[in-house]
Amino acid sequence: RSVDQVLKALRVAGGGRPWHGIAHAFNGSEQQAQACIDLGLKLGFGGALTFERALRLRRLAADLPLSAIVMETDSPDIPPHWLYTTQAERSEGQAQGRNEPSELPRIAQVVAGLRGMPLQALAQASTDNALQALPRLASLLAASDGGLHGT
């Protein structure tokens, strides 16, 4: 329901103009995804879709237009399945793995596998999409480190 409320507010506030931005840690329906895309937003996917039971998210990541997808870690929150420990495991002393930006390539590999495409092509598309969604990002990156590294 919160996605629908945000979409309604964006439609009202936008007055018909497209938005630039990313629906962070998107976990909505196919209809909500399309509504975000129609408003000009990109959809952020991260660790949540690495769980095999996340069927809807995995289907969206596989089927949505590549131009709508941005990869994200949401570190330290929303760890991928390989870092997650259950409440029972934690009560027995097993530590929760720490989600860090270094997990992004492995998360992206899951999405690339779902889409049946090379990891590098997904990484480039995600970078391009992030730069479209956040137009000032390119100039900020250039000012901070001389360009995009690792894309």
Language model features with spans:
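Mid-to-C-terminal alpha-helical segments outside catalytic/metal-binding sites
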Residues: 98-151
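Alpha-helix boundary/capping detector
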Residues: 62-63, 86-87, 137-138
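Residue-level "edge-of-site" marker
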Residues: 49, 74, 125
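A short, structure-level motif marking secondary-structure boundaries and short turns
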Residues: 16-18, 92-94, 137
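Residues at secondary-structure transition points
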Residues: 1, 27, 52-55, 91, ...
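Catalytic pocket-lining loop regions of alpha/beta-barrel enzymes
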Residues: 1-71, 79-82, 132, 142-150
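Short acidic/histidine-rich active-site segments
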Residues: 67-97, 122
